[in-house]
Structures are given as structure tokens and as C-alpha cells.
């Protein structure tokens, strides 16, 4: 049996079940998937009872809560997991006023420190032959990103709570001027996250005195980021709509969670929710990650 824990990447945001990388990798094996869009790594003391559709990005159940919800580990041979980006926060990463050093520091804290503790606990629950496959991250934006229009990156920022205009100052941010700073944040997160996850894997294996954990690099390059020459991520359409496979399903789930847009109960969350697939592996991207998982055995 293969168990999947983690955030939107391991959940397979925007993908039909047959296109999710854990489904491809499992090759028909029983596949409990507890991963959830928006999940933070959290801590072993998390007690949130928040429950919504896994396509809706919310912090809980955290990855710690996900693993603690499993009551029988006897039949689990492989655990696929990830975590860290939501602890760092996409709002920080996509904010041009966030310093690269801050992104790097927070990413190391969560992808290395917090993940190490999680892996050690998780490994203690597995049978001796069990394995943990830790999936890395990828560049959301890169130096090769060239949006079709400035509205696309503007909407990406706004949907994650980053202001692009000021009523008080009567100004609108020049997207072309600030995009390079956002790119640097995205690249800093990508490289530091994967270094941190590798370090967490190594530390956990050392403390366990056996090679239980493996790091799985998705193998994406800057050319595979949003609006790059060979994107392996879901993008926005020219009309600024999500382009994924389960948009209709997610739209209904978002409306159930946040209400009718006309009444504006939680407009920001609703808008983010409906476009939650943007920046996640598309069908080709998920297939590539599945290939990397298969190479790990």
C-alpha cells in the first residue's frame, strides 16, 4: 500500500485522479491519499478540526495531523510526502518587498528543521521495510517566465494577498519593474527548499541508522516554470481563468466553502480557491514526477 501525505503538490492540485503522480507511480496498488491543498507541516500538537475538499487551499489538516490520523501502518510499504511551502507562505514568496534572505531563512527552517522531525516520527511508525519518498519543489517563476500580459502575474500576486495598487497613494505597481524581484524569491525558495529537504532526508537517515528516506527531485528547470518556453505547471488562460482538469469541481467546492461571490463574504479566499491550480504541476509535469519516483524504485 502507498500512502500520500503533504500539500497541494502531492495532492495533485488540478489533476484528474489518473493523472496524479502517485496514481501513476502506484500502478494499481491501494492508494490512500490524505494530502491536502494548502497544508502546512505544522506540529505534532496541531488540533484543528478544519475539513474542506482537498482542492481548497487551507492550512489544515497539517502534515502532522495527516500522519497522526493513520491508525494502521502495517500494510503501508511506501509513503510519498512533501511540505514546507505553505509554512513559508506564497504571500511572502510572491511579494517583491520580501527580502531573498528572509525567504531562504524561513525555507531552511521548515524544509530542513521541521521536516527532519516529521520524517523521524514518520519512520518510527513504518515497518522495517517501509520507505519514505520526499518530493521536492520546482521554480514557480523564473528568468525565462514571459507572461502574455501584465494582468497574469498581477492576478497571481493578488490571489495570494499581495497588493498591486494603492488607493491612498493613487498608484499601481509596475509589474515589469517588480517581476525580477519576485523571480529571485521563487528561485531562492526552490533551491533552498530542495537543499533543505535533502538535508532533512540525510539527517533522518543518520538518526535512524538506516536509509529509510529518499529525496525525489522533480527534475524541473527554469524553462518549466510559469509562462516559460516549456511550462510543466498549470497557468492562467488569457481570460485569467484556471486551465486545469477539475476547475468545475473546485469552483463548486469553493462556492460551498466561501459562499456566493455576489455577497462577498470572503472574496479573497474565494478568488484564490477558484484559481488554486496555478503554479502546480500539469499533466506533463505530474508524469515527469512519476518518472522520477519510479527511478527511485
Predicted ranges, named:
Residues 5-6, 11, 135:
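Short hydrophobic segments within beta-strands
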Residues 41-44, 87-93, 141-151, 225-228:
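Short acidic/His/Gly/Ser-rich catalytic and metal-binding motifs that mark active-site loops
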Residues 67, 115-123, 194:
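Generic structural signal for well-ordered alpha-helices
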Residues 83-84, 135-139, 218-220:
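Short, well-ordered beta-to-alpha junction loops that form the rim of enzyme active sites
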Residues 126-131:
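A short helix->loop->beta-strand "cap" motif at the edges of active sites that frequently abuts
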Residues 146-191, 199-280:
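Mobile gating loops/cap/lid regions near enzyme active sites that modulate substrate access
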Residues 281-285, 289:
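Accessory beta->alpha helical hairpin/"wing" motif in late/C-terminal subdomains of nucleic-acid enzymes
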